[in-house]
């Protein structure tokens, strides 16, 4: 199921979704064609950790390729963030918490920018009875500057999976992931689990709305686990171009208070 696959890619990579198809195919059907999609998008997040505020803007670019049931995707952001200098702000996604906090008496706020971490994912979709399933391996390559506190400077990797089922014009889904976090110098980190539940609502053959709840375990004891709710709209501008917008609101104290996203996918 394309919707299930593409939703997980979006959740896992934190990048724009691939050009989605709203006409969901039966899970018994083997898709044999090959698609390549160029990805672009922007994400804005703001919040506070331990009373320290931050704002982050990520400009993402990437590519996704699908052949039959196999999917490969890669993305890399350019990050601009304003935050206390002792906070490490990463590009988020399944392979790291959006924010790592190191205990410090410093509180000077600084603005830094640069290339974020490269995210790679390889996945496979398959049916389980009446369900559509997708499983993927994920790697975060530490291309972001550790000196600028735009990343941890360490390699992360993990597994993620999602199941979904179409019921009329509704497609409920649930996803989960486990991530092995590379430990940066000066931080005590732990591996993390994350998950989300929600549903797609098919408005037409080319448009859908998604509502979801997400939980993400913190990689450090200095930051609380994240909980949030979100809503998004994805629609086709043409047979090759899709546009998506989404918004999330934090439910826990250390989760981003607000997160806004804009994405576009151009298929070939």
For each predicted feature, which ranges?
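Active-site cleft segment of glycoside hydrolase catalytic domains centered on the general acid/base Glu
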Residues: 187
């Amino acid at each position: 199921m394309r919707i299930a696959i593409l939703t997980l890619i979006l959740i896992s990579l934190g990048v724009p979704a691939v050009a989605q198809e709203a006409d969901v195919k039966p899970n018994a059907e083997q898709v044999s064609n090959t698609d390549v999609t160029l990805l672009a998008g922007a994400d804005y997040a703001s919040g506070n950790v331990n009373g320290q505020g931050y704002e982050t803007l990520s400009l993402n670019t990437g590519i996704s390729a699908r052949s039959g049931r196999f999917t490969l995707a890669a993305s890399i952001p350019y990050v601009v963030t304003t935050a206390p200098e002792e906070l490490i702000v990463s590009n988020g996604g399944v392979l790291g918490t959006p924010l790592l906090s190191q205990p410090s008496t410093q509180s000077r706020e600084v603005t830094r920018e640069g290339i974020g971490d490269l995210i790679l994912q390889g996945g496979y979709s398959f049916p389980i009875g009446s369900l559509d399933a997708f499983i993927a391996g994920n790697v975060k390559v530490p291309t972001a500057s550790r000196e600028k506190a735009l990343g941890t400077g360490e390699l992360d990797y993990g597994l993620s999976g999602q199941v979904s089922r179409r019921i009329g014009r509704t497609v409920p889904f649930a996803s989960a992931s486990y991530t092995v976090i590379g430990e940066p110098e000066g931080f005590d980190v732990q591996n993390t689990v994350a998950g989300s539940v929600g549903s797609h609502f098919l408005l037409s053959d080319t448009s859908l709305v998604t509502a979801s709840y997400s939980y993400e375990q913190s990689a450090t004891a200095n930051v609380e686990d994240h909980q949030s709710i979100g809503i998004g709209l994805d629609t086709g501008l043409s047979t090759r171009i899709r546009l998506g917008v989404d918004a999330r609101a934090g439910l826990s104290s250390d989760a981003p208070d607000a997160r806004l996203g804009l994405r576009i996918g151009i298929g070939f």
